[in-house]
Every structure is written in C-alpha cells, then in structure tokens.
C-alpha cells in the first residue's frame, strides 16, 4: 500500500473510532470493571451484623470468608448494606448472591446511591419504582444491568424480601468505571 492510501486509511479509522466513542458504544463496553472486589473491609458499612463473621466486609461476590457474606441481626426492611467506592463512579450494573452455604439470600431489594453518604436517592427504572429481583438460592449470581447508569461514590442495598426459610444474606458486586475515566472519553 502506498503512503498516501495508508494515511487515508489511518484517518478513516480514527474518524470511525471517534464516532463510536461519541455515540457511547465504546464507553459502555469499557465501563464494566469490578468495583467492589478490591475494596478494603473499611469500605463496607451496615445497619447491623449478626456476628463478627457476618460483618459487611464479607459481602463480596463469590467470596467465602467469614460466615460467607453479610447478615444483619434482624431480617426486616430496616436493614441496609452500604459500599463506599472511594470516588465518584459510573455504575452500569449490580450483581448479588446469597450468603455462601446457607439458606440466606435476598429475593428483592432497592438500590440507593449518594455522593456524600448522607443524602440518598433511590434508583428508579423508567418503567417501575426500581425494585430489583434478587436470588433464588445462596450461590447463583443475579446481575442487573442498569437502564440508566448511576454516578455516585456510595451505594446502599435495602433488602425488601428474602428467602422464607432463611434470613437476609448478601454478597454483592457493582460494575462500572471511575467517573474521571468516563468524563475523559
């Protein structure tokens, strides 16, 4: 290929990439990194914990540490699990599991988000209030891609329903990318 055609081909490729990025296609594909897996235990808070081995720091997806996930003292709708992602983050999906090797899992939950950790907003889907279906057992993963991405530093899961033969039990992962990365694209 002569130098002129090579240059034209390079320009066409750059224009095509620019069009993909501006349409959001590349951003969506690039913004699905795990955001919870590498967080320290201090990034997790909860309304309560059943014991030290059921503490919120054990609520990471696919982990078996402690008692295999987070469980609060009481199983009621006043419980919550909170994640501090460290910085503003673009969240594109959320995945849950029950507490490993148990009868404890959520069957429905609400997702809240915040930049401050004090003022919370409830995630809402276009066609519903934003209640997410949870799990049907302790170990399968249920992942929900968010119809509208969330930009926030903090996430809070509020259990709404759980297995009738168990209690609230949760392991979680959020997928996305740093907000600063999203803004640069």
Residue ranges and their predicted role:
Residues 2-30, 64-123, 146-185:
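Aromatic, loop-rich ligand-recognition surfaces of beta-strand-rich domains
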Residues 27-64:
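Predominantly extracellular/luminal regions of secreted and cell-surface proteins
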Residues 45-50, 99-100, 124-131:
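Short, solvent-exposed aromatic-acidic interface loops
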Residues 46-48, 67, 114, 131, ...:
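Polar, glycosylation-prone regions of secreted, cell-surface, and some intracellular proteins
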Residues 57, 107, 133-135, 168:
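A short, polar/proline- and glycine-enriched secondary-structure boundary/capping micro-motif
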Residues 59, 70-71, 132:
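Short clusters of hydrophobic/aromatic residues that line enzyme substrate/ligand-binding pockets
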Residues 59-61, 126-128, 185:
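Short intrinsically disordered coil segments
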Residues 121-145:
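Extracellular carbohydrate recognition and processing domains
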